[in-house]
Amino acid sequence: MEPSPLELPVDAVRRIAAELNCDPTDERVALRLDEEDKLSHFRNCFYIPKMRDLPSIDLSLVSEDDDAIYFLGNSLGLQPKMVRTYLEEELDKWAKMGAYGHDVGKRPWIVGDESIVSLMKDIVGAHEKEIALMNALTINLHLLLLSFFKPTPKRHKILLEAKAFPSDHYAIESQIQLHGLDVEKSMRMVKPREGEETLRMEDILEVIEEEGDSIAVILFSGLHFYTGQLFNIPAITKAGHAKGCFVGFDLAHAVGNVELRLHDWGVDFACWCSYKYLNSGAGGLAGAFVHEKHAHTVKPALVGWFGHDLSTRFNMDNKLQLIPGANGFRISNPPILLVCSLHASLEVFQQATMTALRRKSILLTGYLEYMLKHYHSKDNTENKGPIVNIITPSRAEERGCQLTLTFSIPKKSVFKELEKRGVVCDKREPDGIRVAPVPLYNSFHDVYKFIRLLTSILDSSERS
């Protein structure tokens, strides 16, 4: 029976349990969800780490040939199997023809980045000419802020969320200092209310309305790295524009995780990395977006050879013919080996589509949430053991695939025991463990096994 597009995860779980005449927490529910999953075959496009290869594993607790339970795609995505093939293609080309590789093959090196932009446009919801694939995320953020942050005595602030990812915080702080401004006065952070972990949308909009005339740039995460909160990008953009602000986003934890419509939402600029949900490998090629409305008005503050139009680039006359829009921000030759790894992943996304992946993700993370609450919620009167609290918003439209968990016992001991059993997740200060079932390669049975292991760990801690 095909689930309704509007069916809530909890309803889907209960529906299947009723069909199977079993409890919603039964393993058969997870197996049926996997049977109904039309995206399950994409798992075969990735290398899944084996238990025996994990550094913290206790082989007395697991079968060494089993797949790990990999819930860390929010930090580093798994390797697409085609990466090695694409890398070898370019290494062979280099070995066999040297510099001729710049101009021939399916990825001519001189336009290597441009050869895969078409695969990125639907993931971020942008036109090809609005996207540049280059550098690393924070470098791109600096380049964009140099062009969009033009403070005046009246409009000099950058607005961001409190406890933004440190690299964003440092970048904004240093940009403010670069202009000789006082960080205390020009760096405006929106904080959660007392006793709350996440930001309320009304509080963000209130700050924009009340202080917008003094804000030059609003720069938020699309999705917060710690709490997993997905911000309302179109609403923030609309509110910022109403007050005359430029609005940009760091999409590190949003790209490849949730559906984006950067062009339609009118976002001024954005940047992202590609090694998390986009599976391009550590330090993979990052991306930048500049809305086409700024193509001829907002120009890069720093330029290089690859911002010059290719048709006249080799005239060598030192007369800059700047490419309008995002591609004008490119400075240097694209790193073709990084292009290869990103290419391998983006092809999988093109086949799966973000719409289908997001639909599965809502159900997958919803199933995880249901199971956590069933066994370990403080609201479950039958739960006499340690409590698991989910600080990530419960509404699907306010989160991606990640849930951030806190515990009534020290997280360090929980994390260590999970590692021993082949669960790959991470801990983040002050007290969270981040768990991210990724729809491209994680299964509902992964979630079921994780819950079984976590329950066993918590039960053991209670007995000891």
Swiss-Prot record:
Sequence positions bearing N-acetylmethionine: 1
- What one GO molecular function would you report for this record? protein homodimerization activity
**Names of required cofactors:** pyridoxal 5'-phosphate
Q: What domain of life is recorded for the organism?
A: Eukaryota
User: Catalysed reaction(s)?
Assistant: L-kynurenine + H2O = anthranilate + L-alanine + H(+); 3-hydroxy-L-kynurenine + H2O = 3-hydroxyanthranilate + L-alanine + H(+)
Q: What Gene Ontology terms for biological process does this UniProt record contain? A: 'de novo' NAD biosynthetic process from L-tryptophan; anthranilate metabolic process; L-kynurenine catabolic process; L-tryptophan catabolic process; NAD biosynthetic process; quinolinate biosynthetic process; response to type II interferon; response to vitamin B6
Could you say what a knockout of this gene produces?
No visible phenotype. Mice were born at the expected Mendelian ratio and are normal. They however show very high levels of L-3-hydroxykynurenine compared to wild-type mice.
User: Could you tell me which InterPro entries the record lists for this protein?
Assistant: Kynureninase, PyrdxlP-dep_Trfase, PyrdxlP-dep_Trfase_major, PyrdxlP-dep_Trfase_small
Entry EC number(s) = 3.7.1.3
* SUPFAM superfamilies named in the record: PLP-dependent transferases (SSF53383)
Keywords carried by this UniProt record: Acetylation, Cytoplasm, Hydrolase, Pyridine nucleotide biosynthesis, Pyridoxal phosphate
Subcellular localization, per the record?
Cytoplasm, Cytosol
Q: Which PANTHER family match?
A: KYNURENINASE
Q: What is this protein called?
A: Kynureninase
* Gene it is expressed from: Kynu
